[in-house]
Amino acid sequence: MTALTPVRSAGTATPQIAPSIRAVGTEDKREICAITRATVQAAIEVLAGTRPIHQLARRLDERCLTALQHRAALIRHESARSPRKLGGLHRNPAVRSVRACEVTPDIYEASAVVIDELRTRAVAVRLERSKQVWRVTALEIG
């Protein structure tokens, strides 16, 4: 007795993913991109001295908030000391693009490109969900 298995071409097998799972992942990714865009914009404005650091206290964890505050203080100190205006380096920043990647269902890593009048910067962000709230646990501004 011979058993024959039907042969399928390589392009016909498509993995079936439940629509509810796909929708949740897509919705999380949209939310992560929106949070990243707003957080990066605010962080660049903090460095420029046009936004107070406390506005990011709910979004950033303590370590990120302290590091950003320290960097902003260094920039302010250096611009006060320098004869040329360093504050002009951060004028009119705009977040041009945001990309996000799921590490686990509760952890995402994202990158953003920020352009201002004189330079383009890359920003990397790690977001972790705790008690249904996304918080930035790592923020690297290039």
Located regions from the model:
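Juxtamembrane and targeting peptides
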Residues: 1-47, 76-77, 81-95, 100-103, ...
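Hydrophobic ligand-binding cavity/cleft-lining segments
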Residues: 38, 47-51, 61, 65
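Short solvent-exposed beta->alpha transition segments
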Residues: 54-91
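Hydrophobic/aromatic beta-strand elements that line small-molecule binding cavities or substrate pockets
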Residues: 97-100, 111, 123-127
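Short beta-strand segments that buttress and anchor functional surface loops
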Residues: 109-115
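Short beta-strand edge/turn micro-motifs at domain boundaries
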Residues: 120-142
